[in-house]
Amino acid sequence: MPSDIEIARAATLKPIAQVAEKLGIPDEALHNYGKHIAKIDHDFIASLEGKPEGKLVLVTAISPTPAGEGKTTTTVGLGDALNRIGKRAVMCLREPSLGPCFGMKGGAAGGGKAQVVPMEQINLHFTGDFHAITSAHSLAAALIDNHIYWANELNIDVRRIHWRRVVDMNDRALRAINQSLGGVANGFPREDGFDITVASEVMAVFCLAKNLADLEERLGRIVIAETRDRKPVTLADVKATGAMTVLLKDALQPNLVQTLEGNPALIHGGPFANIAHGCNSVIATRTGLRLADYTVTEAGFGADLGAEKFIDIKCRQTGLKPSAVVIVATIRALKMHGGVNKKDLQAENLDALEKGFANLERHVNNVRSFGLPVVVGVNHFFQDTDAEHARLKELCRDRLQVEAITCKHWAEGGAGAEALAQAVVKLAEGEQKPLTFAYETETKITDKIKAIATKLYGAADIQIESKAATKLAGFEKDGYGKLPVCMAKTQYSFSTDPTLMGAPSGHLVSVRDVRLSAGAGFVVVICGEIMTMPGLPKVPAADTIRLDANGQIDGLF
């Protein structure tokens, strides 16, 4: 089979206006970025307010492994399949970060015959949204230091500035820096550092805002520092929000592209799935729901992180509710959860599959605990055996009373996911239960953390280190105790130890630190080491990326 980039380049793309027609979007509502990408105008989106909404389908996954699960590929394949069976469907995805493209090979536009295109533009600069977010964040950083330089009327304590700088690149050298060196004219020297743009709270706010007015209000709530008497200082206090909103105005319009089969996809925003909620923008999701019968979206990492945050943060803030949930699993990944080494995955191993099934089992039960109907999409790999697929379907049927459907969208496009699409429609149009949450926001922050750890992770208890406990007490005192929590832990395990695969139970979830994201509207709970500025590998993908004699990019994918 050809590579992803070869498949994408061989595709004949429709003019973006034709793709927009499928959703009833007129030409005048499009801001074109070439022939195959467009932004959807704010005014058109505002005109959709009050329209009935279609069905929302959430795609999540088991705990990820190096063997790969193919969640984005399944999201695209399912969207194509829904269109094939006569449903007007749109996919809502996150934008890829630029930095990782030059670190580890590969993008985030699906794979095989289930891709969104134009692939290279999507994975690189796209429409410049991340540049706008980087600029807005950088403007805030400049205004903070400028305020301190010119008399510091807010009495900001330079030892307690929480606002770091950002760049959309993997660069470990910028994790910790000294700034304002070189003399009095350059300001007050202090320690600082950079995060990657997707870790910025501006990105999280961007993806949770309902409109421009809500965006500006949320930006104003962001706490960027403390005064010398330990009072919070916000972006509104340093008068940054108006100019930041101006920089983000055009970026807040969702981006329209297409799949290889010419179906519409909205790709907008891309917050970290760890220290943020890991979902595409609310504006894109709402737009999709008001224009299509089915909107298929995904949440970052496994269901313990992505789906939980989608429900407890995004759905709680917006009133959204999925009508069906697809949990993506692979035979390969389940065998890894059952103890098989990656190099041995090609050999049939029913015992390891059954042992690793415990991971899928817990994810299914967790999603059901929110009152949501579930189907398992088994992403097919050519090394899989018929016996392994049959055994997995048997386990799902007998132990979970849930349907598991083998999907071949990577090799066959939408045609390979039609059975999954039919199952999703059956669930979405069937009986619906009220959405429930893992915790109530009225409870203390520590109780919310414990609820997630014990109910969803299988933990016996939580342990909050003294630094985190002190900060939590301060958040409660300052009036932030009713916010939801955003868990930041390893994606590879239900525990905080990435080597504990399967479905560990009885462990302790240790909380090392907490951070306030008042603009986004949650408290980040850090369990273990969380890296907000990645580094490049020993041999980065950038080493082999070039333009060939025909002006095409070589080595990116």
From Swiss-Prot:
**Which organism does this record belong to?**
Methylorubrum extorquens (strain PA1)
A biological process (GO) of this protein is: tetrahydrofolate interconversion
The UniProt keywords, alphabetically, are: ATP-binding, Ligase, Nucleotide-binding, One-carbon metabolism
What metabolic or biological pathway is this protein involved in? One-carbon metabolism; tetrahydrofolate interconversion
> From what superkingdom does this record's organism come?
Bacteria
For this protein, the record's PROSITE patterns field holds:
FTHFS_1 (PS00721), FTHFS_2 (PS00722)
**Coding gene?**
fhs
Q: Which is one GO molecular function term here? A: ATP binding
The text of the family note is:
Belongs to the formate--tetrahydrofolate ligase family.
Which sites bind ATP? T65, P66, A67, G68, E69, G70, K71, T72
By what name is this protein known?
A: Formate--tetrahydrofolate ligase
* CDD domains in UniProt: FTHFS (cd00477)
- Could you tell me which Gene3D superfamilies the record lists for this protein? Domain 2, N(10)-formyltetrahydrofolate synthetase, Formyltetrahydrofolate synthetase, domain 3, P-loop containing nucleotide triphosphate hydrolases
Q: Which reaction does it catalyse?
A: (6S)-5,6,7,8-tetrahydrofolate + formate + ATP = (6R)-10-formyltetrahydrofolate + ADP + phosphate
Q: Its Enzyme Commission number?
A: 6.3.4.3
